[in-house]
Each structure stands twice: as structure tokens, then as C-alpha cells.
UniProtKB/Swiss-Prot annotation:
<dbReference type="InterPro" id="IPR001492">
    <property type="entry name" value="Flagellin"/>
</dbReference>
<dbReference type="GO" id="GO:0009288">
    <property type="term" value="C:bacterial-type flagellum"/>
</dbReference>
<dbReference type="GO" id="GO:0005576">
    <property type="term" value="C:extracellular region"/>
</dbReference>
<dbReference type="Pfam" id="PF00669">
    <property type="entry name" value="Flagellin_N"/>
</dbReference>
<protein>
    <recommendedName>
        <fullName>Phase 2 flagellin</fullName>
    </recommendedName>
</protein>
<dbReference type="InterPro" id="IPR046358">
    <property type="entry name" value="Flagellin_C"/>
</dbReference>
<dbReference type="Pfam" id="PF00700">
    <property type="entry name" value="Flagellin_C"/>
</dbReference>
<dbReference type="InterPro" id="IPR042187">
    <property type="entry name" value="Flagellin_C_sub2"/>
</dbReference>
<comment type="similarity">
    <text>Belongs to the bacterial flagellin family.</text>
</comment>
<dbReference type="GO" id="GO:0005198">
    <property type="term" value="F:structural molecule activity"/>
</dbReference>
<dbReference type="Pfam" id="PF21504">
    <property type="entry name" value="FLIC_barrel"/>
</dbReference>
<dbReference type="InterPro" id="IPR049365">
    <property type="entry name" value="FLIC_barrel"/>
</dbReference>
<keyword id="KW-0964">Secreted</keyword>
<comment type="function">
    <text>Flagellin is the subunit protein which polymerizes to form the filaments of bacterial flagella.</text>
</comment>
<dbReference type="InterPro" id="IPR014981">
    <property type="entry name" value="Flagellin_D3"/>
</dbReference>
<keyword id="KW-0975">Bacterial flagellum</keyword>
<dbReference type="Pfam" id="PF08884">
    <property type="entry name" value="Flagellin_D3"/>
</dbReference>
Length: 501
């Protein structure tokens, strides 16, 4: 080996080995301090990619487990509401069994029916208000999808159903006793279209209202007219030159119950034109029926002319004892009356109708006549109560306000209907119970999978402390030895000086 001064190859070799041992020491210390074998992609590129995929799966499965727990909570909340609905149905069934006993009086049946109605209303309330995190669980048919896996399509569905008195088939449940209406039971009541003759203001009334003017003779009169929802009194007969300006039209009020016409405290003069003279007042001014209502009237046997001229009236009934009973609204077509609904706020009129199949096979919708429509079974609605006229064949069915018991159409086989409702609730509760068990199973499986994936990831990226401690010790020794050897290597060029002595 040549003796040189400029290049100390032994020193360079030693420095290189010292750098390697220092790098190894740094790596060992990094792994020991972080606990990870792979701290960056340079440590193990393939291992880092695999471990990262495991991390994504582990995080996704952990969240899926939380989702499944939320699914259990939803199902549990819904099942709890169904349990309360079931309790109400059990009570309704108990009441239905009680009502079937012939020892009950009509007042007993009315009380039983009142509680049944309240129980059904509570079922509707529970159905409409039960929710989980803003989602109403029984108000409508719905399918909730719960993500229970780390990948697309790994879901469990919760099928929710609308549960209320209507979907249970109990919205018209009635256990009140039904009576047959025989010919001798029919009460021939009278109808009133709600009109009253107007009581026009007298000369004395007019004088008092308009300041006691001078009038010659008995000439002071007032004729009443109507336009756009207002009544007017056309005053005439002022003969004194100073008072003739008081002749003209004034807004007045009309008492619909008595027909009395009166001026206001401060009479208001009007220039209205086109008003129509009236001699009677009605609770509701006549309102013309719309096209659909006219068609229903015609299908009920009303002539086209009478249907076009049909107007709305307020009904009242006088029973056999002379008692006057306020009824609902009706459409007057010709000399007959037909049950109707009237919205006082909007003025909308709708005839109460019955759909039936005519002899020619066509389906028609006829207005319900207060007395029968086209020979079909009809009903009369008075003050919200329905009266069945089917048993009064061959007779003019009028109002029977005294026989409300006869009006109620008793539900046939009520216990069978309630049992069907209970079965419907039980079926949904069973589904919810089963899906809760599914979620529990999914959570257990997710936990096992997360554990196994975590172990697999650990074997790839976690530090083996036994190995890394050994590596650190080796690197430390090499560092110390390398430093010592480097000092010796740096002394080698000194040997060349001996040749110069």
C-alpha cells in the first residue's frame, strides 16, 4: 500500500462505517420512541400501503359498530312506542268485551265508546309524535338503511310501518248498540230553511236614528236591499227642504234570528248601486253550488234546472215534542234538501255524496238527499251525528235527534278487528326485535374483525422492542468503536513523516 498524505483511505472507510452505525442508531431510537416499525414509506413501502388499508378498514368497521348501535336505539325506541300502542289496544279489546254484554244500558255503552275513542286518539298521538333524532318512526311507512360495514352495500334495513287507528282498521270502531228503525219509530219532523221575514224600520226608528227630522204626514219609509254581503236601507219621505238630503241609502244591520233591521249608532250613508231588494233574511245568504255539486245533485235525481238553482240553507228540525234542534247545512234544490258541507271561511260548498253502481253498470256519485237518494241506503247528518235510514224503507225518513243510539252503526265483529290490529302490531314488534338481534350479532362480528385486523396491522407496522433494543445496543457499540478507530485512522499519515527525518 502506497504511503500518501493527501488521501487517508482508512479514515474515509472508518467515517463511512461510523455514519452507517449512526443511521442505524437513529432508526432504532425512532422505532423505540414511536413504537412503530414503519414511521415513513422509506421504512417499508409495501408494508406502509398494507397497514394503511388495514387502518381504513379498522376505522370504518369501528364507525359501523357505532352505526349498528344507533340502529338498535331506533328499533328500541319504535318498539317502545308500539308497546304503548299495544297497551291501548288491549284496553280497547277489554272494553269491547265489556260492551258485548247485554246488561249494559245505553249510557254505559256511551261511556265505553267514549273511552275507546280516547284510547284510539292516544294511539294516533303516539304514532304521530314518536321520533328518533327528528325521524318520525310510526307516522308513515319508511325504510331506514343502517351502514354496518366498511364498504358499499354492507347495510341492514329497518322496515317501519305507519301505525294508527286508521291503518289498524279501527278508526270507525263503534261498540254502541244499534237499533232497527221501524216505520213506527220514524219521527216526521219539519224542515226550516233558516229564513226570517224582515222587520223594516218604522218611521219612529228612522227619525231616532237620523236626528228627528221634520216630516209631513206618514211618508217616511225604508226599503231594505242587499249587495256584497251588506244590507242597505233606502230611506225616503223627508219633505222638509232642510232634511231632504237625508233621503238615500244607509248601511244597516240585520238580525238573522229575528229579521230586525237597525241603523248603527252613527248611520253611514252609501252610494251603492245594483243592490237587490230583500224581504227575508237568512243565516247564510244563498250560495250557488259549483259544477261538481250540481253533477252530484243530478245523479241523485235532481233536474238540471233545479241543480243549477240550488242554494245553501241552514237546517233546523222540529221533533214530535215541538223541540227545535239546529242542524247542519243543506242544499235546497227545488222542494228537496240535500246534506252538504259548507266552509264559512272560504264559502266552499260540497254536497255529501254516496257512490253507487247504477243499473247500466256505471258508477255514480249522488248527493245524499234528506229523505233518500235513488232508493239507496242513505244517511242524514245532524250536528255531527249520523242517522241510518236503511231501516225506514217505504217511509219518508226525517230527522231523529232523539234516537242517537239508532244512528250509530255498530262495528261488526269488533273483537275480530281488534285482534287483527293486535296481530299487526305484534308483527311489527317481532320484526323490530329480530332486527335488534341482527344488530347485536353484527356488532359482535365487527368487534372480532376489528381485533383481528388490528393484530394483523400490528404485526406489519409495530416495533419489535426486543429486536430494536438489540439494534440500538449494537449501533451504540459500533458508534463508540468507530469513533475510537477513526482517531487511530487519522494518525496513519503521521507515519509518512518518519521518511522525512
Amino acid at each position: 500500500m502506497a504511503q500518501v498524505i493527501n488521501t487517508n483511505s482508512l479514515s474515509l472507510l472508518t467515517q463511512n462505517n461510523l455514519n452507517k452505525s449512526q443511521s442505524a442508531l437513529g432508526t432504532a431510537i425512532e422505532r423505540l420512541s414511536s413504537g412503530l416499525r414503519i414511521n415513513s414509506a422509506k421504512d417499508d413501502a409495501a408494508g406502509q400501503a398494507i397497514a394503511n388499508r388495514f387502518t381504513a378498514n379498522i376505522k370504518g368497521l369501528t364507525q359501523a359498530s357505532r352505526n349498528a348501535n344507533d340502529g338498535i336505539s331506533i328499533a328500541h325506541t319504535t318498539e317502545g312506542a308500539l308497546n304503548e300502542i299495544n297497551n291501548n289496544l288491549q284496553r280497547v279489546r277489554e272494553l269491547a268485551v265489556q260492551s258485548a254484554n247485554s246488561t249494559n244500558s245505553q249510557s254505559d255503552l256511551d261511556s265505553i265508546q267514549a273511552e275507546i275513542t280516547q284510547r284510539l286518539n292516544e294511539i294516533d298521538r303516539v304514532s304521530g309524535q314518536t321520533q328518533f333524532n327528528g325521524v318520525k318512526v310510526l307516522a308513515q311507512d319508511n325504510t331506514l338503511t343502517i351502514q354496518v360495514g366498511a364498504n358499499d352495500g354492507e347495510t341492514i334495513d329497518i322496515d317501519l310501518k305507519q301505525i294508527n287507528s286508521q291503518t289498524l282498521g279501527l278508526d270507525s270502531l263503534n261498540v254502541q248498540k244499534a237499533y232497527d228503525v221501524s216505520a213506527t219509530d220514524v219521527i216526521s219532523s219539519t224542515y226550516s230553511d233558516g229564513t226570517q221575514a224582515l222587520t223594516a224600520p218604522t218611521a219612529t226608528d228612522i227619525k231616532a236614528a237620523l236626528g228627528n227630522p221634520t216630516v209631513t204626514g206618514d211618508t217616511l219609509t225604508a226599503a231594505v236591499s242587499f249587495k256584497d254581503g251588506k244590507y242597505y236601507a233606502t230611506v225616503s219621505g223627508y219633505t222638509d227642504a232642510g232634511d231632504t238630503a237625508k233621503n238615500g241609502k244607509y248601511e244597516v244591520t240585520v238580525d238573522s234570528a229575528t229579521g230586525a233591521v237597525s241603523f248603527g249608532a252613527t248611520p253611514t250613508k252609501s252610494t251603492v248601486t245594483g243592490d237587490t231588494a230583500v224581504t227575508k233574511v237568512q243565516v247564510n245568504a244563498p250560495v250557488a253550488a259549483d259544477a261538481a255539486t250540481k253533477k252530484a245533485l243530478q245523479d241523485g235525481g235532481v233536474s238540471s234546472a233545479d241543480a243549477s238553482a240550488a242554494t245553501l240553507v241552514k237546517m233546523s228540525y222540529t221533533d214530535k215534542n215541538g223541540k227545535t234542534i239546529e242542524g247542519g247545512y243543506a242544499l235546497k234544490a227545488g222542494d228537496k234538501y240535500y246534506a252538504a258541507d259548507y266552509d264559512e271561511a272560504t264559502g266552499a260548498i260540497k254536497a255529501k255524496t254516496t257512490s253507487y253502481t247504477a243499473a247500466d253498470g256505471t258508477t255514480k256519485t249522488a248527493a245524499n238527499q234528506l229523505g233518500g237518494v235513488d232508493g239507496k241506503t242513505e244517511v242524514v247528518t245532524i250536528d255531527g251525528k249520523t242517522y241510518n235510514a236503511s231501516k225506514a224503507a217505504g217511509h219518508d225518513f226525517k230527522a231523529q235527534p232523539e234516537l242517537a243510539e239508532a244512528a250509530a252503526k255498530t262495528t261488526e265483529n269488533p273483537l275480530q278487528k281488534i285482534d287483527a290490529a293486535l296481530a299487526q302490531v305484534d308483527a311489527l314488534r317481532s320484526d323490530l326485535g329480530a332486527v335488534q338481534n341482527r344488530f347485536n350479532s353484527a356488532i359482535t362480528n365487527l368487534g372480532n374483525t376489528v381485533n383481528n385486523l388490528s393484530e394483523a396491522r400490528s404485526r406489519i407496522e409495530d416495533s419489535d422492542y426486543a429486536t430494536e433494543v438489540s439494534n440500538m445496543s449494537r449501533a451504540q457499540i459500533l458508534q463508540q468503536a468507530g469513533t475510537s478507530v477513526l482517531a487511530q485512522a487519522n494518525q496513519v499519515p503521521q507515519n509518512v513523516l518518519s521518511l522525512l527525518r
